[in-house]
Amino acid sequence: MLFETIRARVAAGILLAVFLTAGNVPAQAASTKNIVLVHGAWVDGSGWKPVYEILVRDGYHVSLVQEPLTSLQDDVAATKRILDLQPGPCILVAHSYGGTVITQAGTDPHVVGLVFIAAHAPDAGETEAANGKRFPSATSKTNAIEKTPDGYTYLDPAAFPKAFAADLPPEQAEFEAHAQVLTAAGVFTAAVTDPAWKVKPSWALVADADEIINPDLERFYAARAHSHVVEVKGASHSVYQSRPKEVAALIEEAAQHAQDR
C-alpha cells in the first residue's frame, strides 16, 4: 500500500512538472504558406518569375496579380480578387507602384503581413507623385517619362535600361523597354485612404541604386511603417528580377514571422 501511494505521488508530480514546463514554452506561430505578388507600373507580373520559382521550390503557394494599371481603384480590385482565392492567411508583396496598391488592399482579412520591394508605401491622403517631389529620383529629374494623348505613361525605351533595369542583362533590359504596359497617369496622383501598414506588420527592401524611386524615399517609408528593412547594395529598381534570392529570403522571413507579431 505504501509503495502504491508513493508511486501515485511520483506520477502526479511528473505530470505537474510537464504541465508547468509546457506552460512556460512560448507557442510557435504558424508559418504563412500563401504568397501574393503584385507588380508595379510599366510592367506585368512575369517579372516575378525568378522569385516565384524560389518560393514554389521552398514549398509556398504563390499567386500573382495582373493589375490593369488603369486606376488605383481598378488595381486594388484586381488584387482583392486574388486575395479572395487564397486558401488561408497570406503575405502580400509588392514592387514599385504596387506598394501603393497593397497599402490600400492590404487591410483585407486574408493578409497577415506586407512586403515592400523597392516600393511606395503612402500614408492616408498621400500620393506617389507628391512623395516623389519630396524625394526626387534620378529619373524624375529627366524627361524620360512620356505620356500618350489619352493619359497613359511609359518610360522612353532609350532610357529604360539604365533607369529601370541597370543590373539586368542588356538584352533583357532592352526587351522589357519595348514590352512596357502603359500605365494610367492617374495612378500616380491617386491618394490612399486606409494604409494597411499601420495595422499589419511589414518588411521592406531598399534598392540602393534605384533610379525610379529615390532610395531615401524607400528608407523613409520603411522607417515610418516600422518595417523590418534590408538594403541591397548596387541594386536597380528591377531588384526583384536581378536579386531574386535576397527578395525571396525577405518574403520567406515575413511568412515565417508575420503571425507572431
Where do the model's predicted regions map?
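Flexible "cap/lid" loop of the alpha/beta hydrolase fold
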Residues: H110-P157, A184-V187
